[in-house]
Amino acid sequence: MSEEKDRVDGTADETKAETKSSDHHTEDTYEKVCFMCRRPESKAGKMITLPGNINICPDCMQKSFDTMNQNPGQINEMMNNMNNMPNIGMFDLSGLSNQIPNRQRVKKKEEKKKTKEFSIKDIPPPHRIKAMLDEYVIGQERAKKVMSVAVYNHYKRVFAPQDGNIEIEKSNMLMIGPTGSGKTYLVQTLARLLDVPLAITDATSLTEAGYIGDDIESVVSKLLAAADNDVERAEHGIIFIDEIDKIAKKKNTNQRDVSGEAVQQGMLKLLEGSDIEVPVGANSKNAMVPLETVNTRNILFICGGAFPDLTDIIKERLNKTASIGFQADLKDKYDGDKNLLSQVTLEDLRTFGMVSEFLGRLPIVFTLESLNEDMLVEILKEPKNAILKQYKRLLELDEVKLEFDDDALRSIARKALEKDTGARALRSIIEDFMLDIMYEIPKDSSIGEVIITKDYIEKTGGPTILLRGQEVPKLEQK
């Protein structure tokens, strides 16, 4: 009898242990989900558990408190009139447990493997950085060289042993180039090749703290999110602020410039290096969201813009240096110079409306060339992830070969130049012409090859479509 009792007790203990182990495994495998917004704990932050095992995220809890605090009179009035409203009852939390959907927890995403410790020996030299950029970016030779050296020096500064006597300044950059010349693409490619987190923001959305719009510190919050909330990784990342020319100082205005000069002034400490408190898993600071401190001292800032009126300022400066008798000739010469931006000076940028202190924190200034027809044709064909290679691969999956005539590529490049939006026009043009082809091909398994011709691009004919094993055109677009 005693042995049997011991056996039963042992079985019970084992069951308890298994249950405990199972619960522990569940906790490790699953995460809580907010009852109101349905975001998991990894996205919304640590959950607040209410009676009945109801999980609420900090954001939703804060919004509930804010709503109650805004209209206390209305809530009191409703409470006083409860007896006169027989069909309405108070919200009972205890009854919620029966209404909660089963899916209150979701599986945790597998944790990413920790990246290798980065050291000064791992920093690729400038010629290797440029060689990697060459595989993806066509042209812009000087811009790629300047960026390669600046990035190399920046990360040397970050990972080199500290020398108390010499402090190396940050290599923040200002790139100036026409729309569609590849500013954003260059930065994206650079960050991907170096495997560092990247945050891209638009300067037009930034305003001085306290005004409607994104405050200046929000750019650091985006970088922290890009680094999966890993502060150390974020502190070695890159922030790209596009359309920086849009925050130039406004001229002849008596109103406070909250989205121009004030934003430039507000960014000074950020560019130089300071401790910034940013919310984790939320877009704005509030009492219920945990904050992380991010130091921007080792974050590389790259600003870019088209600066559309800057060429007029450069022309005016160059003409002032010429004698009166030659001014007309020089003006005509500069009017035809598509790469006039390459002669920009800091004085020109100050005249444009950029604050001197702001420019002082962007020591490396360089320009990008305007894209010509030859460069656009190269962009279509040559990079590792060229647009044509992507479409060829898509048709390969349908076992169809895709080719483009050289004249067709020239015609596409000319159409892109007419749109005056640079390389970004190429994809939309090709997508437009490929739509019908990609729609029709899966219908007919006998099609073996499609050749895009100049006539098709210029809408005077159709593509050449060949049957499998045949050399004779099958269909022409009407």
Language-model features, listed with the residues they occupy:
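Non-catalytic accessory segments flanking P-loop/AAA+ NTPase cores
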Residues: 1-240, 245-478
